[in-house]
């Protein structure tokens, strides 16, 4: 096996680049001749072109250099007609802007405070209404005194009866038993209220 001759290969590559390739007809079935097999055939060139346009060496070099150095962005794209003078100005500028000492300083600055007029006001909801927040005159009770003592005792009795039978299964309670218990408590409270009054008058 013969050793690889780099110099001759380089000369052949330069010769291929210097010679423009000829255009071929798209209707020609054997555009490349009989020397190429069917597996090696390629699509012919465009019929309107007389010769292929070779890439510019400076454009290829600058595009490859900017791609490898990660300097190409959406705002910095090298055109096909770029020259070495354009790259000499833009590439160092992009590198210096990326590696600038001012970027960490800007990132470390304190963020601006938002204005009070821009921020929306948070409405605090009202507290829920409970029995503790309701006033006492809602229940119709009066202040305790000597004149309205029986009415006060009767009101306390009604409240106690309501609290006693306020159960989840209160619908199953017999109405007759409820009435009997109501009459018994009513008579008991009135007897306890009137007995001290009668004893006070007798004395």
Curated annotation (Swiss-Prot):
Note: Partially overlaps SPS19.
Cellular compartment(s): Membrane
One GO term describing the cellular component: membrane
Protein keywords: Membrane, Transmembrane, Transmembrane helix
Protein name in the entry: Putative uncharacterized protein YNL203C
UniProt superkingdom: Eukaryota
Organism: Saccharomyces cerevisiae (strain ATCC 204508 / S288c)
Membrane topology (UniProt): Single-pass membrane protein
Transmembrane segments: 89-109
């Amino acid at each position: 096996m013969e050793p690889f001759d780099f110099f001759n290969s380089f000369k052949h590559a330069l010769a291929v680049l210097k010679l423009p390739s000829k255009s071929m007809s798209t209707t020609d079935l054997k555009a490349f001749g009989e020397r190429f097999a069917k597996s090696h055939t390629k699509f012919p060139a465009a019929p309107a072109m007389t010769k292929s346009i070779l890439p510019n060496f400076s454009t290829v070099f600058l595009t490859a250099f900017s791609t490898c150095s990660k300097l190409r962005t959406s705002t910095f794209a090298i055109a096909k007609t770029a020259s070495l003078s354009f790259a000499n100005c833009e590439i160092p500028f992009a590198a210096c802007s990326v590696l600038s000492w001012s970027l960490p300083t800007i990132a470390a600055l304190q963020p601006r405070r938002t204005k009070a007029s821009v921020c929306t006001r948070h409405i605090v909801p009202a507290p829920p209404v409970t029995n503790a927040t309701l006033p006492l005159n809602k229940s119709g009770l009066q202040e305790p005194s000597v004149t309205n003592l029986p009415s006060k005792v009767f009101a306390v009795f009604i409240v106690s009866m309501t609290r006693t039978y306020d159960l989840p299964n209160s619908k199953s309670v017999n109405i007759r038993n409820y009435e009997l218990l109501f009459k018994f408590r009513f008579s008991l409270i009135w007897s306890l209220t009137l007995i001290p009054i009668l004893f006070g008058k007798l004395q």
